[in-house]
Amino acid sequence: MAGVWKVLVVLVGLAVVACAIPRRRLRYEEVVAQALQFYNEGQQGQPLFRLLEATPPPSLNSKSRIPLNFRIKETVCIFTLDRQPGNCAFREGGEERICRGAFVRRRWVRALTLRCDRDQRRQPEFPRVTRPAGPTA
């Protein structure tokens, strides 16, 4: 249930801040940076995440809808109001997440939806324990 509240708080925060964005056309990188900032604000008491890579759409024909697709990775820093993830090193073996969503801008309404799921292709590495194959004497 706490996870649902966290997502809801992040979405409401994104919608509120998205309304404050000026009417100029935003670059893809700016939208991704804002999405990551709000995602991290929902991580209170948890490690911050930093951008690994962003995949812009092939073309941004639409001025009103920008699809988002980027990967983030856990850092060694814990969330505080003044901490910037860009100043934090990636955590060795840290969790990676794939984020997808959209930034939508219509006349008076601006909203950003975002979902970040664990990257199943990158399972955490655990130390391997080897045991002797035969009986021990």
Swiss-Prot record:
SMART domains: CY. PROSITE patterns: CATHELICIDINS_1, CATHELICIDINS_2. Residues 1-20 form the signal peptide. GO terms for cellular component: extracellular space. Its main location: secreted. GO terms for molecular function: cysteine-type endopeptidase inhibitor activity. Large granules of neutrophils. Disulfide bonds join C77-C88, C99-C116. One of its GO terms (biological process) is defense response to bacterium. Keywords: Antibiotic, Antimicrobial, Disulfide bond, Secreted, Signal. It is found in: Secreted. Binds to bacterial lipopolysaccharides (LPS), potentiates strongly the early antibacterial effects of BPI. Inhibits the late lethal action of BPI. This is 15 kDa protein A.
